[in-house]
Amino acid sequence: MKTSKVICITGGIGSGKSTLCQLIETRGYSVYYSDQRAKLLMNSQHNLVQSITVLFGESAYESGTLNSSFIADCIFKQKDLRVELESLVHPLVKEDFLRWCNESGDEIVFKESALVLETKDKNCHFIVSVIADENTRIKRVKKRSPEISESRIKEIISTQYADQLREKHSHLIIENNGKVDELEVKVDYLLSKVI
């Protein structure tokens, strides 16, 4: 099995980490999107579906599809449920990521994950944190998910690592308060540091 160099991209909700990763993909690099893969596993991995149903009840799935808004409400009201859910999902995502790396065959891969620092991800060779001011983050989340209230967005932000902690535990910080063309320049700088 070939070992890939793993560049982890992290940041809080609305920071622009997914946009950064999409720009990285346009330059020919492979990106593993942890949240997307976790949702895929939570919808397709039979034992995981059963465990989530036991943990959250029948409302966890609607017509065989994960009821994400119900799960989100539950884990914000009961922090212990979040910890239990993470203990079910994270090991499977880690396994899936390692399999994906092996299948990609790439020397360098990128991994997008909001929880790189919180979970002390051991697969990361280089950590990049994307940060943005709170108002910018709120506007971005409202634009893509208008059903989420501003107070809920602020609540989510308050549960995530502060930018000062990200700065302390990252190899590179990318400030993303501007437009995509400004981010393009920062992607090129990032690639020059890791390639």
Indicate residue ranges for each PLM-predicted region.
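ATP-dependent small-molecule kinase phosphotransfer cores
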Residues: 36-106
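Small-molecule kinase domains that catalyze NTP-dependent phosphoryl transfer to phosphate-bearing small molecules
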Residues: 105, 122-123, 144-193
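ATP-dependent NMP and nucleoside kinases share a basic, alpha-helical "lid"
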Residues: 96-102, 108-144
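P-loop (Walker A) phosphate-binding loop of NTP-binding proteins
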Residues: 12, 24
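ATP-binding Walker
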Residues: 15
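Residue-level signal for inorganic ion chemistry
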Residues: 35, 85, 110, 174, ...
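Hydrophobic anchor at the beta1->P-loop junction of P-loop NTPases
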Residues: 7-9
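Walker A/P-loop
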Residues: 18
